Amino acid sequence: WSGWLEFHGQRYEFDRDMTLGTKDRSWGIRPLAGGDRRGAPALPQAGGLFFLWAPLHFDDFCAHYQLFEDTKGRTLFSVGALLPVYGSIDALPGVEDPTVTHCRNLEHKLSFASDSRMIESVELAMTEIESGNRVSIDFEKLFTFRMKGIGYSHSEWGHGMWKDEVAVGSEQWDLADIDDTAFENQHVQHLMRVRIDGNEGIGVLEQNILGPYEPYGLEGAIKPPQK
């Protein structure tokens, strides 16, 4: 990624050789507050959500880990893969690259803060489908990005909320005052230093864990883990 952002008179420059990112997929039309009510209907609520997503960048490859589980820890949806790196957009093949290594059996081992559901440490793993090789991913947490800042669970600037033709606003929070037990702060991304088989890279671990989740003894809607 390259370009710049300006906020309250301070300009931030981004160099493509130093700035890594992930472009999310298009989700099509969604029935969001105040906007177009068409689109796929919402799924019936099953009493909880356990979601982990980790796009990870290394010098010579990328890794992708995405997992939805139900309250008992049963897999609802998963994607795991090791992917090649391209030098430019023009180098993209236009079809799925045959060198992509698809994975299954996504695993996780999480530990949480003592007073909230914020992940403090994590180990992930997945198994290559063709070879059966188990890929272990080690993480070192650097800091936490609040998804509320881009509209998720925000009461006024909700993600995709219709605000008429033009609406501009800004907001600031003192991160030291953030309440990690509040509902609107449960959806976060942790910037991580990551390692796979001696390769060191950078990426994020996104978490959204709501409702009970038996494997980690989580109860209630957003109740912290039991001590």
What are these regions (language model features)?
Residues 1-227:
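Structured soluble/peripheral alpha/beta segments that form catalytic or ligand/cofactor-binding pockets
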